[in-house]
């Protein structure tokens, strides 16, 4: 049985696809790269944003035509199955549906002669998804979250928090390092909620990272994924000690979403801006060169001009290293979708205005690195084919004179230029320090 898989969305989805590939190969299937060669077509969907949903629905219409010509079986997997099963079933009634909670049953669905609708159920944590692309490994440490944000459809799709057993994560890291990964991305919807479902005596994120560092030898670097302020704060000091470890990137991703307490309350976020600010200040006081990334949504229902300008001021004040900016889009079955909406032209104006501030702040922060010498680990190629390295704090450095065969090595670089998004540099004397 030949299976083609098409994937949309986040790191968790890419990891789920890798798990599906492994399971399919174990049950006698061949994963192919050409959709026209496939007996079975799997589309792993994402539902976090309206534009992504629309792109997937448009693609599914085209795949329906391919299925008619090739007589292939169609399976739709991923977050749209959990959050919008009726939309999918109406568009493609002949497709089997497999939610993220049922991904471990993919072989059963592929080999079934019937259309299967596996939507409900609990996610199995007996096997952990592992996605390796080049020298970068993405390892989920948990599924779901403890939040109930008014705008978020991912909560509906990924559901309640389920942490993967500590030893399973450690084993996955060991396997990734064995296969040549030099960057280990520990990912989840909220990494600092790890272990909160495992009981009072269960491991938390700092415990997990210490166990990895102790039990997995080799030259690799750990990047910690997104951590919500309310779950980060209780483990903050412990996590700071872990961040000081040589093999952990000095990097945190803490979503702010809005600096207006009025909007945060409407969003059902579990912190105030003042609490968020204290976390950022504490991190910088202990690790001065730490990189702090954040997420901001503009145009959420209830956000007025004053709220927006509070957020604008906060970005200028806190000097974030990286900001992922999103215009709010209503998602089905969410509380915010039923609220009075901010007009689209207003959302667009706020997005454009804040984007300019983000660029100015990013450029100011990154210019501090110009003419500095830095050790970098060469992790991947950019979409243009340039070699990209990472500083100790995960700042990206595009190396203009490095060749693709050097990915996976460490080197010293001279930083010559800066943009708001990355640094540009060259190898010092072309010397590679160490193969990792």
Regions found by a protein language model. Name each.
Residues 1-194, 252, 274-285, 309, ...:
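Proteins enriched for Cys/Gly/acidic motifs involved in redox and nucleic-acid/cofactor modification
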Residues 30, 34, 67-72, 112-117, ...:
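Short, glycine- and charge-enriched coil/turn segments that flank and shape catalytic ligand pockets
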Residues 36-37, 68, 146, 259, ...:
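Short strand-connecting beta-turns/loops that link adjacent beta-strands
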Residues 74-78, 83, 178-305, 316:
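Conserved SAM/AdoMet-binding glycine-rich loop
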Residues 104, 147, 159, 192, ...:
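Glycine-centered loop/turn positions within well-structured domains
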Residues 254, 295, 315, 323, ...:
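Hydrophobic, well-ordered secondary-structure elements that form the walls
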Residues 330, 338-436:
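Terminal RNA-binding accessory module
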């Amino acid at each position: 049985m030949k299976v083609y898989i098409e994937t949309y969305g986040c790191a968790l989805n890419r990891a789920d696809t890798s798990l599906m590939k492994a399971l399919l190969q174990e049950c006698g299937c061949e994963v192919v790269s050409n959709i026209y060669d496939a007996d079975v077509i799997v589309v792993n969907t994402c539902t976090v944003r309206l534009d992504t949903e629309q792109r997937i629905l448009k693609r599914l219409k085209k795949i329906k035509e391919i299925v008619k010509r090739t007589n292939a079986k169609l399976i739709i997997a991923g977050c749209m199955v959990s959050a919008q099963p009726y939309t999918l079933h109406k568009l493609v009634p002949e497709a089997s549906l497999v939610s993220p909670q049922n991904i471990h049953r993919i072989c059963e669905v592929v080999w079934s002669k019937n259309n299967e609708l596996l939507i409900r159920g609990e996610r199995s944590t007996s096997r952990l998804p592992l996605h390796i692309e080049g020298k970068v490994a993405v390892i989920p440490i948990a599924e779901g979250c403890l939040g109930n944000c008014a705008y978020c459809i991912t909560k509906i799709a990924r559901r309640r928090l389920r942490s993967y057993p500590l030893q399973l994560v450690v084993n996955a890291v060991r396997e990734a390092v064995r296969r040549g990964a030099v960057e280990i991305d520990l990912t989840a919807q909220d990494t600092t909620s790890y272990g909160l479902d495992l009981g009072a005596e269960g491991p938390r994120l700092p415990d997990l990272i210490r166990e990895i560092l102790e039990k997995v030898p080799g030259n690799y670097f750990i990047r910690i994924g997104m951590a919500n302020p309310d779950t980060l704060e209780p483990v903050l000091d412990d996590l700071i000690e872990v961040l000081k470890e040589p093999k952990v990137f000095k990097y945190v991703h803490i979503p702010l979403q809005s600096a207006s307490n009025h909007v945060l309350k409407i969003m059902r976020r579990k912190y105030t801006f003042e609490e968020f600010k204290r976390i950022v200040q504490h991190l910088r006081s202990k690790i001065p060169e730490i990189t702090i990334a954040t997420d901001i949504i503009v145009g959420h229902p209830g956000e007025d001009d004053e709220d927006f300008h509070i957020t604008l001021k906060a970005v200028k004040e806190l000097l974030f290293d990286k900001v992922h900016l999103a215009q709010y889009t209503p998602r089905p079955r969410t509380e915010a979708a039923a609220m009075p909406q901010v007009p689209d032209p207003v959302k667009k104006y706020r997005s454009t205005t804040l984007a300019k501030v983000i660029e100015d702040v990013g450029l100011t922060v990154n210019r501090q690195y110009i003419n500095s010498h830095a050790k970098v680990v060469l992790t991947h190629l950019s979409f243009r084919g340039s070699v990209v390295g990472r500083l100790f704090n995960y700042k990206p450095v595009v190396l203009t004179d490095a060749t693709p065969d050097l990915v996976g090595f460490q080197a010293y670089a001279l930083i010559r230029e800066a943009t708001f998004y990355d640094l540009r540099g060259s190898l010092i004397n072309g010397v590679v320090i160490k193969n990792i």
